[in-house]
Amino acid sequence: MLCCLVFKGLLSMDLLRFLLISPFALIKGLYRLSAYLLRLVGRLLRPVVGNLNWRAPQWMTKTANGLHCAFNRSEQWVAKHPKGISAAIVLLMAAASAAFYGYHWYLNRPQPIEPAPMVYQETSIRVSAPRTVNYQAQKPEAQPLSLNFMHSAAPITAMGQVVDQGISLTPAIEGEWKWATERTLVFTPKKAWPMGANYQITIDTEKLLAPQIKLNQTELNFTTPAFAYQLEKAEYYQDPQEAQKRSTIFHVQFNAPVDVASFEKQILLGLVEGKSKSEKKLNFSVVYDEKKLNAWIHSQPLMPMDKGGSVHLSINKGVNASVAATPTTQAQNKWVSVPNLYSLAVNSINATLVESDNNNGERALIIAISDAVKDKEIKNAVKAWLLPQHNFQAKESAKTSTDFYPWDMDDIDDNLLQQSTPLALTLNEAEQEYQPIFSFKFDAPSYRTLLIEVNNSLTSVGGYKMPEKIYQIVRVPDYPKTLRFMSQGSLLSMQGDKQISVAARNMTGMKLDIKRVIPSQLQHIVSFKSSEYSSAHFNRLSDEYFTEHFQYQTALNNDNPGEINYQGVDLSRYLANNPSARRGVFLLTLSAWDPEKRDNQQHSEEDYDEDQEWVGDSRFVVITDLGIITKQSQDRSRDVFVQSIHSGLPAADAKVSVVAKNGVVLLSQITDSKGHVHFPALDAFKNERQPVMFLVEKEGDVSFLPTRATYDRNLDFSRFDIDGEETPSDPRTLSSYLFSDRGVYRPGDRFNIGLITRTANWATALDGVPLRAEIRDPRDTLMSTLPITLDSSGFNELSYTTGENSPTGEWNVYLYLVGKNNETSMLLGHTTVNVKEFEPDRLKVQLQLTPERQQGWVKPQELQANINVQNLFGTPAQERRVTSRLILRPMYPSFAPFPDYLFYENRHNSDGFETELEEQTTDLQGMATIPLDLKSYADATYQLQLLSEAFEAGGGRSVAATARVLVSPYDSLVGVKADGDLSYINRDAVRKLNIIAVDPSLNKIALPDLSLSLIEQKYISVLTKQDSGVYKYQSRLKEQLVSEQPLQISPTGTDFTLVTQQPGDFILVVKDSQGQVLNRISYTVAGNANLTRSLDRNTELKLKLNQAEYLQGEEIEIAINAPYAGSGLITIEKDKVYSWQWFHSDTTSSVQRIRIPPAMEGNGYINVQFVRDVNSDEIFMSPLSYGVMPFKISTKARQAAIELASPSVIKPGEVLPIKVTTDSPQRVVVFAVDEGILQVARYRLKDPLDYFFRKRELSVQSAQILDLILPEFSKLMALTSAPGGDAGEGLDLHLNPFKRKQDKPVAYWSGITEVNGETTFNYPIPDYFNGKIRVMAISATPDRIGKVQTSTTVRDNFILTPNVPAMVAPGDEFDVTVGVSNNLQGLKGKAVDITVRLTPPPQLEVVGEAQHSLSLAEKRETLVSFRLRARSALGDAPLVFDASYGSQSSRRTVSTSVRPAMPFRTQSVMGRMEGNKHTVTNLRQMFDNYAQRQATASHSPLVLTQGLARYLADYPYYSSEQIVSRSIPLIMQSKHPEMDSALNQNEVRDQLKNMLRILSSRQNSTGAIGLWHASPTPDPFVTPYVVQFLLEAKSAGYSLPNDILEGANNALRLLAARPYDDLYSLRLRAFAVYLLTLQGEITTNTLASVQSTLQQLYPDSWQTDLSAIYLASSYRLLKMDDEANKLLQPTWKQLGKAYSKAWWTQNYFDPLVQDATRLYLITRHFPEKVSSIPPQALENMVLALRDEHYTTYSSAMSILALESYTSQVAAQQDTPETLQIIEISKSKGIDPNVISTLNGLFVQGDFTGEAKAIQFNNYASAPAWYVVNQSGYDLQPPKDAISNGLEISRSYTDEQGKPVTQVTLGQKVNVHLKIRANAKQGQNNLAIVDLLPGGFEVVQQTAPEPEFYDNQDDQDEETGSGWQSPLMVSGSSWYPDYSDIREDRVIIYGSASTDVKEFIYQIKSTNTGRFVVPPAYGEAMYDRNVQALSVGKGHILVVPPEAK
C-alpha cells in the first residue's frame, strides 16, 4: 500500500514537472524550427545572390549567450521546484480573478443618478471687426468690435452688464466690454481705432462665459479697416456755359479724412495724344469737400485734338490720412478718353406714335445726337423721303394694296430717290436752344418706309462735327386698332332709342353678330352662360340651340385712321313685331369687317390668320323696361320688386315667375300696385326643377334675374355698418344674460352670478327648462357644474366660493341648455369674473380738458387741464400728489363727421413728444390745475394724451385717469373731397371737388377771400453747381404756376371742377389772403381719354336719419343725398323685409319717410336703392347707388318699473336700509358694493335689455339688375365733346402662509326675492368701512326686465386711511402713513386737537414716536407717518390705529404680512443604515413658523414612504398625474396607521371626492382623462395610471363613482387595441391590458397581440422592459403560470443589478419607477418569490430616494411597492431599545437627547431647531431604514446661485432701462426675469416664483380709462380674445403658458430653451423704506432635481419724491 502511494506520488510529481517544463521544451522546439527554415531559405537563394559571409556584432553574440544561459538555468530551477512554482501560479490566478471581479463590481456598483446633467455646448466665435468710422456724421463715433457666439454664451447674470475680467486685447486700447445680448459681446473704444492695425483677443473661458459653454479657440485675431480710397467717376467735362472750356475731372473718395499734402504729392497727370506712347505732363488742381473725404482732380484746360487721346491719372502709394492710420501700400491708375474733333454722331432715329390733344394720333420722328446741337441747325440738316410702296423692279414681290416692300440701305440709289416723295418734317418746339434730342411731326401712310438724311453740317455746342452724312431707313408704324362697345351695362330701355354705342379707331368697317334669344329658352342663358351678367361667353352649351341669328355690317370712315369714330347700332329693327312678345334679349359680338372684301373671303382669311390679335367685343344686352330687385330673407323666402327703367315708377300687374332648369314655371304671381310679390323659400325644388331665374313679363316686355348667388348681381354691403349677431331662425331659441355682482374678487371670495334667460320672441314658456352652469378657472379647468331649472320669469342665480389657493386670472361662467340624456348641450350665455389680489380704490379721479371737444380740435393757447380728486367717502382729497405725463403724437387732421374729406397741414416737423409734467398738489377742494405749456412745441396738429395719477396720502398707490384731445393751432381747416380717383384721371374727364371749411367745433363755416392756384409739376433742366466745383444741367422737379383764381367757400361747401384738358401732374393749392397754404390736392391727368365712355366716377348715396333711436310704430325721416336725380326704393330690413316705400326725387337731395312696423323690436336697417333718371347727364357714374343705415328701436315697452332708495349718508357699523318698490310682482336681486372695488373692476351695471335686444346683423341679401342700365346713345353722343369724369388649482407651496388678514370686501347680495309693492333689504355696514357704496337692483318678470342703481356714502367722525405695505420681510424698515380726516359736525371752522396712536403687533417695532397730536379743522384732512422695523417673528401683523378727541374716537386695524424673503422648501433625507449607527448632519436653519423637523426609522422599508408622503403633500401643482400621486398616501392610511397624515378619515374621503370630481371634469367622451383638462388627444399615460389608483382605492375600502371607472375602462380597451408600435406605446398597451385583466376581463387575444409585436420589433430589449412584467402579471391573473414565470425570469435577473448609468425620459418613467413597479408587481402577483427578492432591488430604490432623485409618479409607485412588500414580509418585533433616534445639539454642554424609541413598526420623533445632527442607533441584527424630513423657510438666502438644469437671473431697472437700487415713492420699476436651460430636463414645465420686495405691488398692464363716469350704464366693457399675461410689458422674449399674480409674489409657468428668455413685468413702490430683495426661484414641476435660485441682491431703497 505504501509503495502504491509512493509510486502515485512520484507519478504525480513527474506529471507536474512535465507540465511545468513543457513550455520550455515548446520554446526550444520553435527556436530550432525557425533556424532550420532560415537555413533552408539561404540555400534556396544561394544560386541567385551567391555566398554571404556575415559575422554578428559582439553585443549581439554576448546577448544571445546570456539569454541562452538564463533560459537553461530557469528550466533547471523549475524542474527542481515543481511544487513552489505550481503554488505561485495558483495564487497569481486567484489574484487575477479577484481583480477582475472587483473591477466588474466597481463598474456595476449602485451609482447615483446625476441630477439634470449639464449639457456642454462646444461653440465657436465669429469676430465682427469694427467698421470704418463714419466721418460724414456730425459727431463721428468709434465703431464697436463684436464677438458673435454660436450659442447662448453669456452668464445669465452678466447680460447687459459691463465685463471687467476674462477677456483682453493686445495691444491694449481704452474702452469697455459689455454683453449686448446672450450671444454678442461688444467692445466699445473710447477713441477711434487706429486704421489698419492688428489686434489679438485672449479669452479666459471660466471667467467670461457661462459654465456650460466650451470654446474651440481662446485666441482670436482681427485687423481694423485700413485707410483706403477709391477712384470713382472720371469724366471729360465741357462747360455748359462756355462750351470751349474742356477738361478732365477725376473723383477720388476716401474712407477717412485725407492728408492733403501727402495726397497731392502722389498725383501724376499726363496726356496721351492719338496712338502715341509718350505722355505729356498736365497741370492739375484739386477740390476737396469740407471733411476731406472727397477730392476732385481737375486737369488743365484741353484743346480739341484731331485724333483724340486720353488723360492718365496715377496716384502712387504712400497717401496718408489726417487721423491715426497706416499709409496706402498700392498705386492706382485711371484713364479718361478725350474725343477727336469729328466725333459728333447720330445715336438713333425712330418713328413713333403720340396722342394729340383731341384724342387723335400723330406720328413723330425722334432723332438723338451724341452732343447738344442747335435747333435751327438740326431743322435744316434733316431731310426725309417716302419710299415707294412696291418695288417694281422685283418681279417676284407682291404688289397689292396691302403689300409693302421692306426697303433697306442696299436698295438706295439715285433712281429710287427719284421715285420717292420728299416728306415734310415739322420740328416740334425745343425746350432749349441746344439739346441732344429732337422730334419732328410728319404724316405718312402706315407700313411705308422712310429714308432719313442727316447732313454733316452740324456743329455741336462743344465744337464737334460729323465726319459725313448719315442715312437711315425708318418704318412708319400703324395706328392701334380699337373696336369696342361703349359704357358698361346690359339694359336698354324699351321706351328709349334702343341703340347700342360703339367706339372704333383705324377700322374700315365693323360687323355686329346679333343672336336673339328665344324667350322660352331663357333658362339656358342662366344655366350655361358665364356668371357675369353682361358676358356673352358660354361655358358648355353652344348658343345656336336657343337663338335666332342676324348680322349687321357697316363701313366706317377711316380717312384719318388716328381719329375715334363713334357709331350707334339700332337694335329695335331686330325686335319681334308681335307686341305681346318683343324678344329683346340679345347676344352681341362685335368684330372687324372690310367692306372691300367679299364675306366668304373674309371668313377664310379670319380662319387662316390665327396669330393676329383679335379686335372686337361682345356683350349680353336686354331691351326691357322692367328693372328687378330681389331680397332674400333669413328664412330663404324672397321679396321681388319690379320698377320701370324709363319712369322709375313701380311696375304694377307684371307677371313674376320662378323658372326651373328645364323651363317649367314653378311659381307665378302678379305684382301689386307697389310692384311687389313675395315667394316662399325655393329650397324644396331640386334636380331638374331647381330654380334658375325670376322671369318678369309685362305687355310683351321680358326681363329676368338669376336666382343663384354665384352670379355677380348681389349688392355688396360690406362697407356699411351691418355687423351684429345672427337673428335666431327659431323664435323659441334661448339666450341668457349673465352678470356678476362686482366683477373682481380676491382668492377665497365668493362670487354671485345672476342669470336671466329669454326666448327669441319672449313668448315661449320657460317653466321647468333644465340648464347646466359650468365654472372654469383661468386654465380652463372645470371647477364646478351646477344644475339649474328655470321658472316662469327666467331669473336664476348661482354662487361659487374660490379657495385661497385658487389660480388668479379670468374665470369663466358658462350656461348651457341640456340636451336629451345629457349628451348634447348648447351655450346660452357666458360671463367672466376676475380673481386677483387687489386693494379697493379710495379715490375718485376726474381729468378734464377744457374746452371739451369730443370732435374737432382745440387751439393750444385755449387748452387747460384740471384734475378733481375726491375721497370715495365724499370729501375732497386734499394735498394729494398728482403726477402727469404728456404725450403728443403728430397726425394729419381727419374727422369722423367728414370721413372722405382730406384736410391738410403745412407741417415741417413730424416728431412726437413724451414728457413728464411738473408734479401738482390738490387744494382744499381736491382740485389741481395741470400746466401743459404747449407753447414750446412746434405749430402742428397733435393728438394730445394726458395721463395723470393721483396718489393716496403718503403712499405709492394711485388712481389714474386719461384724457385725449386733438390740438391744432389753426382757426379753421379746409377739407377737400373728390368724386373719384385723383391718381389717374382720363384726359377731358370730369372730376369734381367739394371744398369745405370747418371751425374747431367742426361746424361748417364760410371762408372768403381765398385763392385757388393750379400748379403743374414738371421736370426741367437746371444748371446746378456740383460738389466738384463745376456746373451741369440736372433734371429737377419744378412747380410752375398755370393759373390762379379767387375762391369763396360757402357755409355748405363749394364745388370745383378740375382742369383735365392737358395730361400731367398737377397740384391745386388753396391759400388765404396772407398766402398761408390751407390745402394741397395732387392729381394726375393721363394722356389718353376715356374712349369707351366706361364708368369712372363713384356713385355714393349718403343717408342720414333724424334720430338714432325710435319707438315702435314711429316714422323715420331719411335725408338722402344722391349723385343724380332719379327714383328709389326704401326698405326696412333685418332678418327679413319688414316694410318698403318707393320714392322719386328731381334733385340730388330729398327727405323721405317710412314707418317702423309696431311689432318690430331690437334694431333694423334702412336700405335704399336709387336709380338714375333716364334724362340725367351723369352717365359716367353707375346708374344705381345704394346705402344702408342702422337704427335702434327703444326697449321702453320691455322695461319693468322698479325704484330703489337708500340713505345718502350713514356711519360705519350702522345698518343700510335698501327700499325696493315695484308696480307689479317681480323677482328682484339687490346688491351693494364698495365703489372702490367697482372702480378697480371697472364694473358697469349694464341693462339686460341691451343684451337681449343687442344689434343683429343684416341678413337680407339683395340682388338686382339696375346697375346694368346703359345710357341712351343720344345722351352719350351729346356729351362726347365733354366726356365725364368719376367721383370718386391651489398652489399652496408657492403661496404666502403668513398672509395678512384683510378686511372682507364690502359687498352685499340679497339673493333673488319676490317683490310686489315695497320691500326693504337691510345690510349691516362693517365698522371699518368708510367710502361710497353703489346700490344696484335687477328685476325680472316673464315679459319685462328692470334695472336701477343709486349710492350711499359711509362716513365716520374721524376717518383713518392707513397706507400699509402688503408684506415685509424680517429686517425691513419702512414708513406707514395714516390719512386723518375730521368729519365732526358743528365745529364752526375751529381746529381741534386730535391724538393719533399706533399699537404695533409683536412682529413689528416702532422706530421713533408711536403717538402724534395734530390740530385739524372741520372737513380738513392731514397725514401722520410712523416708522417701523420688522422683527424675525413671522405671520399676520395687525397694526391698530386710534384717533381720539374728547369723547369722540375712531379705530382702524390694518394688517401687513411679515414673511421670509425665501421660498418654502421641503427636503427629505432617507436611506438604509450602514451598520448599527448613522448620523445625518448639515441640517437646515429655518424659521420656526411652519417648520417641520421629523426623523423616522424602522426595520421595514415602509418607513421611506414617510418622506415621500410629505413631499407629495407639499407638492404645489395639480395635473391629473400629480393629484393622483398625492392621493396614494391617503388611501394607505386605512391599512397602515403608521402612515397617518394630518387628515382624519372623513377629511380623506372629502379630499378624494374633490379629486375624483376634478378627474371627472377632465374625462373626454371616450373615457380618456387629460393631463390638465378634457382633450380629444389626451396624454395616453394618464388614463391607465388613474385606473390603477381607482382600483387601489377600491381595495382600500373607498367607494367610487362607477361612471368614471367605466369610462376609463373603455379608454383602456381602445388603448390596448391601438396599433402603435414604439416601445413606449407598447408599454402603455401592456399596462392597459394588465389593468383590464386585474378587473376580471379575459384579455388573452390582446395579450398575445402585444407580446408578438414586442417580440417582432424589439427582440433584444423588451424582456427587461416594464411591458414584460405587466404581461407576466396578466398571465398570472389568467392562471397561465408557465407563461408568467417564463416572462418573469429576465426581469428577476435585473433585480440584483444596479444601473451602470443614469437615464431619463419625459414619459414619466425613470430608474426608480422601473424598480418600484417591478417590486410592486412581484409582491402582488408572485408572493412565493418575495422572500428571495435580492437586497440590491431595495438598495437601488433607497439610493435614488437618498439622493432625492424622485418625482411625483416615482414617489407614488415607491409607496405602493414598499407597502406591498411590507405586507408580504412580516416585520420583526423588537424591543423599544433596539432602535433609537438621538438629537445632538449645536450648543455646547448639552448632552445628546433620545427623542424617540421604537413603538410598533416605526420609531418617530420631532427634533428642534437647535439640533446640529440626528443620530440613528440600531441595536438589532435586522437592517433599518431612516427618513429625515425638513420643511420650511430658510433663515438666510444662499450666498451662491443654484443652477441645476436651469439658470435664473432677476434685475430691477427704471422705465428707461437703467439699473436701480433706489426708487421714488410711487415709481414703477421694471423687473427683468431671465431664464435659460443648461440641461435637457430644464426645458419644460417650469414654475418661476419671484418674491416681491416689501413695500411694492405688481402693476397689471391694463390701460386706464379716459375718464370715470357716474352714469355708467351705457359704457361697454372691453373684451379681449385669447389668454395673455396681464403682467408682460413690451421687450419680453418669453411668452409663458400662465402667470399667477399674488399679493407678494408672481408665479410664472412655461418652458425654457438653451437661449436666454426674458420676461419683463412692472412693480410699483407703495411705501418708503429699506427693503430686502428676495431671490428668484425656479423649478421643473416634473423633475425635482431641476432647481434654480438667484442671489438676493441686498436691499432696495424707496424714498419720498422730494428726497430723490
UniProtKB/Swiss-Prot annotation:
Region forming the signal peptide: 1-27
GO molecular-function term, one example from the UniProt record: endopeptidase inhibitor activity
Keywords, ordered alphabetically: Signal
Superkingdom of this entry's organism?
Bacteria
Alphabetical list of InterPro entries matching this protein:
A2M_N_BRD, Alpha_2_Macroglob_MG3, Bact_A2M_MG5, Bact_A2M_MG6, Bact_MG10, Macroglobln_a2, MG2, Terpenoid_cyclase/PrenylTrfase
Query: What is a single Pfam family found in this protein's UniProt entry?
Result: bMG6
Family from the record: Belongs to the protease inhibitor I39 (alpha-2-macroglobulin) family. Bacterial alpha-2-macroglobulin subfamily.
Stated name of the protein: Alpha-2-macroglobulin homolog
